[in-house]
């Protein structure tokens, strides 16, 4: 069922086709529109820009017209800048962000979702099987591992808003909290990393009136851990209590 929803029929070519593609996804119930301005680490097409300006703007404008947020997968610098100019709400991965681009993002209010924990998935697969990837893909993965965290070290001090994300599917489900450790390792104070996963993530997704902070009238989404995450953020990997929308899921 999902294959038909994410298959080649959802490719778009040209601005008008991109508008149609967005409307099609919204008609299917999409809350967020995500598209790629560059190739991916796991693809054989490289990380250069794969979209032109009018296509990106058409995607963003149409999504925003329907009140949807827009996330953009972008690794290469030109693709990141293209997404920011087009008005994207967030850049996912942003592996080559430099100071100029970070300043663009801060000025535009574009969030950065670093997805640092993707490297854990790569490292674990390679440890189990050094030949898990074709040579061309392995070279891109080695590069990605080597530059992990560098964009965050540039973007965060320059005032870019950081939101939490893991690129689920590359990172294993249930391993979300790995990202906290890496955000802190590469320069964010523990409280700011926690805010990235709560306050900032809710604001980015447009659900900050419902969740993201513990306030009267908002959803009771609460976790508890044995320890102080401000002293050791890794304790967030072992939750002792989970409440979602007021219902206890784990613990008592």
PLM features: residue spans?
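Active-site environment of divalent metal-dependent phosphoester hydrolases
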Residues: 1, 39-43, 74-81, 96-99, ...
């Amino acid at each position: 069922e999902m294959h038909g929803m994410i298959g080649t029929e959802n490719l778009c070519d040209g601005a008008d086709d991109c508008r149609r593609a967005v409307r099609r996804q919204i008609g299917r119930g999409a809350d967020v529109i995500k598209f790629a301005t560059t190739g991916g680490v796991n693809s054989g097409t490289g990380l250069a820009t794969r979209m032109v300006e009018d296509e990106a703007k058409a995607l963003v404008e149409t999504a925003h017209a329907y009140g949807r947020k827009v996330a953009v997968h972008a690794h290469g610098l030109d693709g990141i800048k293209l997404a920011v100019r087009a008005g994207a709400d967030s850049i996912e991965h942003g592996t080559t962000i430099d100071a100029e681009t970070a300043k663009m993002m801060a000025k535009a209010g574009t969030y950065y979702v670093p997805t640092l924990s993707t490297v854990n998935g790569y490292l674990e697969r390679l440890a189990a099987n050094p030949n898990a990837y074709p040579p061309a893909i392995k070279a891109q993965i080695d590069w990605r591992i080597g530059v992990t965290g560098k964009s965050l070290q540039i973007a965060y001090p320059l005032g870019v808003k950081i939101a939490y994300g893991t690129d689920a599917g590359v990172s294993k489900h249930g391993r979300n909290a790995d990202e906290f450790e890496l955000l802190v390792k590469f320069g964010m104070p523990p409280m700011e990393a926690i805010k990235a996963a709560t306050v900032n993530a809710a604001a980015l997704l447009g659900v900050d009136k419902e969740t993201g902070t513990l306030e009267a009238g908002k959803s009771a989404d609460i976790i508890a851990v044995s320890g102080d995450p401000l002293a050791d953020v890794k304790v967030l990997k072992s939750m002792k209590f989970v409440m979602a929308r007021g219902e206890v899921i784990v613990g008592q």
